[in-house]
């Protein structure tokens, strides 16, 4: 879930 959300926030991970 986090990995997917990180893609939205543009986070490194």
UniProtKB/Swiss-Prot annotation:
Keyword annotations: Chloroplast, Membrane, Photosynthesis, Photosystem II, Plastid, Thylakoid
Subcellular location(s) of the protein: Plastid, Chloroplast thylakoid membrane
GO cellular component, one term: chloroplast thylakoid membrane
UniProt keyword Membrane, yes or no: yes
GO biological process assignments: photosynthesis
Tree of life domain: Eukaryota
Entry's family note: Belongs to the PsbP family.
Role according to the record: May be involved in the regulation of photosystem II.
Anything else known: On the 2D-gel the determined pI of this protein (spot N179) is: 5.9, its MW is: 22 kDa.
Protein name: Oxygen-evolving enhancer protein 2
Organism name: Pinus pinaster (Maritime pine)
Species classification: Eukaryota, Viridiplantae, Streptophyta, Embryophyta, Tracheophyta
């Amino acid at each position: 879930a986090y990995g997917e959300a990180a893609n939205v926030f543009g986070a490194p991970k």
